[in-house]
Every structure is written in structure tokens, then in C-alpha cells.
Amino acid sequence: MAKLHITTWGCQMNEYDSSKMADLLNSTHGLELTDKPEEADILLLNTCSIREKAQEKVFSQLGRWKNWKKDKPDLIIGVGGCVASQEGEHIRERAPFVDIVFGPQTLHRLPEMINQIRSGDRAVVDISFPEIEKFDRLPEPKAEGPTAFVSIMEGCNKYCSFCVVPYTRGEEVSRPVDDVLFEIAQLAEQGVREVNLLGQNVNAYRGETFDGGICTFAELLRLVAAIDGIDRLRYTTSHPIEFTDDIIEVYRDTPELVSFLHLPIQSGADRVLTMMKRNHTALEYKAIIRKLRAVRPNIQISSDFIVGFPGETAEDFEQTMKIIEQVNFDMSFSFIYSARPGTPASDLPDDVSENEKKDRLAHLQQRINHQAMQFSRLMLGTEQRILVEGPSKKDIMELTGRTETNRVVNFIGTPNMIGKFVDIKITDVYSNSLRGEVIRTEDQMGLRIVESASSVIARTRKEDDLGVGKYAVNL
């Protein structure tokens, strides 16, 4: 059987896309996925352009693959993702041995591209933006454990001055709501208990309904939570200016929606937020968090931060540190600013020294880590409900799972617990994980009421004096 290797860099959207590529090429070409690139007949590189020197990283990797192509002339090499979308034909100008260049919105055309190369075409470059077409061409989802990612939309319309996403993934396009619900229902039938909705800006979701209407993100959350078998619901990533009150109401009355939110702010200084074109203030961000905690007091908040943005002063950075303390963030993805080619911010003078950037980043991360450890210590001795994902990476004789607030917990258990919930008493706290002992299995929780088929069939419709229908069991 021919083999496929995919190297993936970047966000969860890229991870999701890579899994779909693997499933697609398995169904169309019988390709078996391998983690050993030297064994592969097709090599795909799914790239990310968010970080500094993304392009050079790509060509460095391609240079290693070039040597294998000399020994195996029929080897097909493809480059996809956001760097491919940015660079297009320039990739082949620097690396003419690359056979296929495709963007995030054209990965569904890979089977045809591969056939073209095998038919003798020199190269194929397709980095177009065909709306949401790719989701219509992908195979049925395959569950790999009790958790799954589902993409609900692509692209972003916000055009933050530092961000390449609108240029590499296009503007916001939402999947029809029925398509999203059908994919999640299929995953639930395969044993998925937790689903994570993906998009560059998920709370801007506006999916078309079967009757031509529009489903908002808040409505989608309620619909997904109602799918039988889905007991936990997460999403990433969202934008503060789209975080409307109807979403907050879902936190009030939908227990399936976890008490964890990743809501990027990037900076705590209004002056910097304006230069970033974030279109909100620090005060408006804090107002969202205040409303959330009014309906879900135990919710944990994580965020993204960029330090050393052009023009960021020491006072601006102190404003960021201040909001970190005020919001009491539990976690963060924080980075030193680096200009992305083609973005408005790349024209600004990069006037913060590298040493200052590094100092600020270290200071920020130290503060976040301190707060995270405080949250973890508060969990010591408490009971936490864990969705068991599988064997622990640190010790295959142990199991691992996550709390509702996204904490990793390792514990001693039995294989039949995988894919189910267990209640754990937290006994130890570490920097990146917790440890505990099982005090209750899912069978002991009474999560689901088992009802015989005959009792369901026995339900009959009865009307009251007003003609209102009710279903009751004949006794």
C-alpha cells in the first residue's frame, strides 16, 4: 500500500485540515498514513505563517525532502497551508522540485492534483478561495477517541493590523448549520463525547439553515449541546467584538458548554489595541468577562498576548500586566511581535529592542504561570469530573483526561474507563498537570437513565381539556 506523510505546523485548524487530508487521500487513493517521512510516496507540508521566519522554515524542511526525491523520482511533494497561500508560485521558484502547492481552501482538490502529477503534469498550483466548497468534498468524519474537532467556519473579516489570516484563509464563510450538526451527530455515534468547534472567529458564525434563514453562534451552541451523546462542548477561537450577550446567555443555561474560554485580547493598552485595529478597548473586554462570571462564576479565562508591538511603551506593557492581574487569566499563548509580510503593521517601525521584547515576554509568562499555579493549588483535594482520553503520555500504565476547565489530569485506572467520565480527587499539583485518584466511575454517576424499548413504545399522546398534547406512559 502506498504511504502518505503529513507534517503539520500551526493552529488547531491546521491539525483539523491535516486529518481531513489523510482521510480524503485514504478514501480516494488508498494512501496509508505514516509518521516516517522517509517511507512515504507522498509528502505533504501543512504550513503556518503566524510566526517569524515562517517562509524560511518551510524551505529548510523542503531542502531535507529534496534529497529523498533524488533517490525516489516518483515521490510527490506538496506544500499547503497559509505559507502556500501567501507565496503561491514563489514556492516553486525557490524549490522547483515541489509538485503541488495548495491553499487551506483547496485541500479537497488534492486527489485531482495528485492524478495530474501522476499523468505527467509538471506542477499544480491552486491557492484560490472557493467559498466553503471543501467541506462538500470531504469524506465522512472518523472519530479517534472521545474528543473531536469540527470546523464550523473559515476565514476572518476583522483585518487586525498584525494578522495574515484574512489574506491566507480568506474572509469569513460559515458552513450550513445542517452540515455542522450532521458531522457532529456522526461523531457522536462513533463515541465522541466532547466536541470542539473551530474557526478563526467562531462567534462570527452565521450558518444558513435549511429554510434559508440564518443560525447564529449562540443558536448553534444550543443545537450542538442538544445532540445525544455530546456531553461537553468547547470552541476556539473567538473575538471580543463578536462576543454578544446571547452567547453569554448560553453559559447561563447550557451545562454542556464548559467553564473555560479562550478570548484573545493581545494587549491591555488601548493605544496599542487601536494600532492593532482590534476595535475594542480594555474596559470593553473586562465588561465581557464580568458578565460571563456573573452567570458562570467558576469560568477560567485564557488569552493571546503580543509583546513588543511597534510603538509599545513600558507604560503600555504595564497596562497589559495590569489587565492580566485584573482578569486573573489562567493560561495564555504569548509571543514576541514579528512583522508578517503584507500586513499593515509590517509598515510600522519595529522600535522595541529584541532584549526588551524578551524581558517583557518572560515577565508576562512568569505572571501567567504564577496565576495558573494558584488555580491548580485551589483544586487540590477537590473532586473533578474528567473525560478519559486514553493512556498518559508520561506513563502508559496510567490514564489521562481533562477537567472541564482544561486541566490535564493523570491517574491510575482501567482501560474500560477510556471514553467515559470519571470523578477524580486531586492529590498532587504540577506545573503542567494534576494527579488524582478515581472516586467514582461513570456507571456510578447516574448520567444516563436506561429505558427499555417497550417503555418508549408504550408512550401515548393524550390531550388535556385545552387540546394540548402530552406523552405519558400507560400504567
UniProtKB/Swiss-Prot annotation:
Coiled-coil boundaries: none
Domain Radical SAM core: 142-374
Keyword line: 4Fe-4S, Cytoplasm, Iron, Iron-sulfur, Metal-binding, S-adenosyl-L-methionine, Transferase, tRNA processing
SMART domains, sorted: Elp3
Source domain of life: Bacteria
Gene3D superfamilies named in the record: Methylthiotransferase, N-terminal domain (3.40.50.12160), tm_1862 like domain (3.80.30.20)
Keyword Iron-sulfur carried by entry: yes
Cofactor or coenzyme needed: [4Fe-4S] cluster
Reaction(s) catalysed by this chain's protein: N(6)-dimethylallyladenosine(37) in tRNA + (sulfur carrier)-SH + AH2 + 2 S-adenosyl-L-methionine = 2-methylsulfanyl-N(6)-dimethylallyladenosine(37) in tRNA + (sulfur carrier)-H + 5'-deoxyadenosine + L-methionine + A + S-adenosyl-L-homocysteine + 2 H(+)
Record-annotated TRAM domain positions: 377-440
GO molecular function, one term: metal ion binding
Residue intervals of the MTTase N-terminal domain: 2-119
Cell location: Cytoplasm
Cofactor binding mode and count: Binds 2 [4Fe-4S] clusters. One cluster is coordinated with 3 cysteines and an exchangeable S-adenosyl-L-methionine.
Role this protein plays: Catalyzes the methylthiolation of N6-(dimethylallyl)adenosine (i(6)A), leading to the formation of 2-methylthio-N6-(dimethylallyl)adenosine (ms(2)i(6)A) at position 37 in tRNAs that read codons beginning with uridine.
Annotated HAMAP family: tRNA_metthiotr_MiaB
Family: Belongs to the methylthiotransferase family. MiaB subfamily.
Protein name: tRNA-2-methylthio-N(6)-dimethylallyladenosine synthase
Gene it is expressed from: miaB
